[in-house]
């Protein structure tokens, strides 16, 4: 059951910094392997923005930071920016989230979601905050960017709600994405994303070898009756 509070929202930045100092920095101090991935986004035929992911793996632990922002033609319709951070452990080659932070900003609203210690706290610009039960599984961003193989099924969450992801097919393929994006052999993982009680989406992830690690080099989200969303990994030209 949600717990609501009328606490003022003047703690946005401090709350995020507290999270990073408490959880992420203890992993960063032992960093042995850090990688930065930059993706260009499209929705249908429209340029939609960029996603930057910074991830560090060290002795079975990980930290993940990301920045998503819209730009280009899509901003004629909407504008959105998000930052996320996650820390956790790798268990049987899959990430297990210990804590997850998401900051979202739209034209007239801001929202901070912090999932840690068995509960999720959600803050809004309106000054109303609430607590909900920690969702099942690991956060979607950790599973998406730190899993280097096609998995059969997993529960993922956005800090607030949990969703089941089930593999429907996989195969070897070769992708060509232009001179400035990844080109090469990949493994295509096709998933069914159970989003809500009756809604399903398609999630296609192409895994390719980039700087000695298998990472998503192309990601496509398929939503019925809507244009596909596509992410393509940038590579040096």
Ranges and model annotations:
Residues 24-26:
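N-terminal signal peptide c-region/cleavage motif recognized by signal peptidases
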Residues 28-116, 151-237:
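Acidic, serine/threonine-rich low-complexity disordered tracts
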Residues 107-148:
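Hydrophobic, well-structured mid-protein blocks that either form specific transmembrane helices
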């Amino acid at each position: 059951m949600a717990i609501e509070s009328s606490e003022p929202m003047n703690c946005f930045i401090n709350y995020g910094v507290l999270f990073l100092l408490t959880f992420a920095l203890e992993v960063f101090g032992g960093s042995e392997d850090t990688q930065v991935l930059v993706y260009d986004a499209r929705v249908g035929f429209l340029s939609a923005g960029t996603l930057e992911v910074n991830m560090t793996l060290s002795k079975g632990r990980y930290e993940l930071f990301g920045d998503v922002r819209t730009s280009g033609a899509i901003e004629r319709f909407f504008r959105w920016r998000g930052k996320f951070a996650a820390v956790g452990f790798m268990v049987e080659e899959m990430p297990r989230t210990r804590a997850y932070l998401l900051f979202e900003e739209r034209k007239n609203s801001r929202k901070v979601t912090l999932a840690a210690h068995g509960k999720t706290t959600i803050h809004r610009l309106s000054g109303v905050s609430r607590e909900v039960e920690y969702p099942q599984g690991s956060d979607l961003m950790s599973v998406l960017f730190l899993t280097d193989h096609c998995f059969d099924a997993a529960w993922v969450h956005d800090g607030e709600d949990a969703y089941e992801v089930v593999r429907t097919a996989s195969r070897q393929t070769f992708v060509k994405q232009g001179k400035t994006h990844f080109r090469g052999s990949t493994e295509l993982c096709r998933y069914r994303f159970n989003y809500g009680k009756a809604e399903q989406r398609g999630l296609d992830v192409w895994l390719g070898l980039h700087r000695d690690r298998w990472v998503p080099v192309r990601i496509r989200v398929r939503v019925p009756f809507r244009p596909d969303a596509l992410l393509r990994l940038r590579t040096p030209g």
